Amino acid sequence: METIYGSSLKEADAVYACQFDGQGGMTPIDMNGVATPVQPFWQHLDYRNPKSYRWLMDTDLLPETVKAGLAGESLRPKIMRTGDGTMITFRTINNSESERPDQLVVFRIYINSQIVISSRHRKVHSLEQVLSDLQNGIGAKTTGHWLVEMVDAITDEVGNFIEDLHDNLIELENMILEQRIPGRGGLALLRKQLIILRRYMAPQRDVFARLASEKLLWMSDEDRYRMQEISDRLGRELDDLDGCIARTAIISDEITSMMADAMNRRTYTMSLLAMIFLPTTFLTGLFGVNLGGIPGNEYYLGFAIFCLLLFGLVLFVAWWLKKSKWL
């Protein structure tokens, strides 16, 4: 196994770098220190940083395929074994205030028994808990343990986001029950978020399951067992996503039905008004022809009587429609 010295990482300009102390804590990387399975190195990079990118391209610690992946070419969740190390790509929730959570962050890891090199561009908030545990002395002790803690934090964030989406879905369903039409934009955004999450979390669950089943030397049986539990948990969350997607389709159908009913009611009302005023329109048109003079023109009460006649006709037609249960 290749000896990895702390000095080989000094030019990386990492977001943060540390060495596990083997007891759940962390220490700064000593330039003369050596990475071991008991006290491995962890270096976290922003691959858009020119110095970090240059280090990734120039270092001898990584295979060429891993360099390209860590530098931003790997997008979908997947796992790739290279010698004694493994390249893993994850997707996690974007909790940055200025961006939407469904704009998932890509998080890439190269890991073996001695070293973890992770990279991203946008901030991975899931790392904060993992880093905090290490700072408090209750974190990972090995690289395999670190990976399990990492995917556990990612899955927790995914689960919390799914709960938020589920709450939004319930609000839309309550609006439908109250005969209020939700905005199309809100439903479209919710459905898009559900579909995007489903698209990337399904292969991510497969990655977790593969990590749990493969005999990776740097993962203990306990690590594999916990990884399988996390994979199962993500699978249940995917089932919830499928149910939510189906419910958005039902809500869309209900909105279409409610809008059609509203349009039909308006059309029906206009038709009834036309039926009520059609006889009066006919009579006023007939009396206004003026071919032989307007009937009753010479009688001073003629106009009043004609208006009463029209009013009575309107009442009669309205009564007839009511009796016929059209109103």
From Swiss-Prot:
Top-level division of the source organism's lineage: Bacteria
The residue ranges for the Cytoplasmic side of the membrane come to 1-271, 322-327
What PANTHER family does the entry give? CORA FAMILY METAL ION TRANSPORTER (EUROFUNG), ZINC TRANSPORT PROTEIN ZNTB
* Family of this protein: Belongs to the CorA metal ion transporter (MIT) (TC 1.A.35) family.
The name of this protein is: Zinc transport protein ZntB
Fetch the InterPro entries from UniProt: CorA_cytoplasmic_dom, CorA_TM1_TM2, MgTranspt_CorA/ZnTranspt_ZntB, Zn_transp_ZntB
Provide a Gene Ontology MF annotation, just one: cobalt ion binding
Q: Which reaction does it catalyse?
A: Zn(2+)(out) + H(+)(out) = Zn(2+)(in) + H(+)(in)
Keyword tags = Cell inner membrane, Cell membrane, Ion transport, Membrane, Transmembrane, Transmembrane helix, Transport, Zinc
Its function, per the record, reads: Zinc transporter. Acts as a Zn(2+):proton symporter, which likely mediates zinc ion uptake.
Q: Which residues lie on this side of the membrane: Periplasmic?
A: 293-300
Where is the protein situated, by its record's location annotation? Cell inner membrane
| Source taxonomy | Bacteria, Pseudomonadati, Pseudomonadota, Gammaproteobacteria, Enterobacterales
| Entry's transmembrane regions | 272-292, 301-321
Task: Pull one GO CC term from this UniProt entry.
Answer: plasma membrane
